[in-house]
Amino acid sequence: MWPKKSWSKRLLSKRLWRYYLRFSERMVTLFRIINITFILGSTSVILVIISLFTPPFSQAIVYIFSLLPLPDMPSAAMSSPPTAYVVLGGGLTNDHNNQIILNRYSLNRARTAAGAYHDLPLPIVLSGAEAPWLGQWLMEHGIDGLISENASMNTCENARFTAKRIPLRHVYLITDSYHMARARRQFALNGINSTPLPAPLPVRRDWMKPAYNLSHSRRAVYEVAAYLRDVIRPQMDCRHAKDVTSQQLLTPRGSVAKNSDE
């Protein structure tokens, strides 16, 4: 028979050993979970990064956007047919002579409007600081009777100021497919229903041209972030219709405006 002290020490040693084994097993399990999580997370990140260079990523974003519901609108807006085209400006750039011209986004929207107009002549409303240049391009291509809203500086103002510029219930909305969901939402918030007429981006998706696909993916990611921002915390820099006068909406800006005044 062992002495009491030896037995106590042996019992304590066994308990410590069991605790150690349990602790070791738990740590091994924890490290396995961390390892699996790291592998799955790393694989997911790599797959997402790779997908940015392929067409399906941006196509999936456009599809998801198409499923998003619009805010409630007046029944008249829901039941009436489109009565005008609304073209949202996409930006300006400079040519080799340092003259201001439409950038490729705005140019594609102008071309989309021209094609739609020739198929179904309806009034064309040009919204944004790009309106004078959009109007000049359309007039050069045989389209007149344009209605310009020159004051808006962002999508929220596009909708508010267009609604103030001319009474509309339902329009064909022309912008790119990534911007479309956010733009339609803003117009719906201002009581205007919209049928999308997406304009193409400057470059097309192409499995053989990863850089083109990345351009689409970057645009898609930006619009996802902008849409969420608009829903969670509306733009602080969006002026209300009462903050601008009718004269401001009618007054063109920039070099094209000066030429037309002369």
Residue ranges and their predicted role:
Residues A181-E262:
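Extracytoplasmic/periplasmic C-terminal soluble domains
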Residues R18-Y19, V171, A226:
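Intrinsically disordered, low-complexity N-terminal regions enriched in serine/proline/glycine
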Residues P55-R218:
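A structural signal for short, hydrophobic/glycine-enriched beta-strand patches
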Residues M1-K4, K9-L12, N103, I143, ...:
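A general, composition-driven signal for non-globular sequence regions
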Residues T29-R32, S106, A226:
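Short alpha-helical segments used as structural interaction elements across diverse proteins
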Residues W2-P81, H240-Q248:
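N-terminal membrane-anchoring alpha-helices
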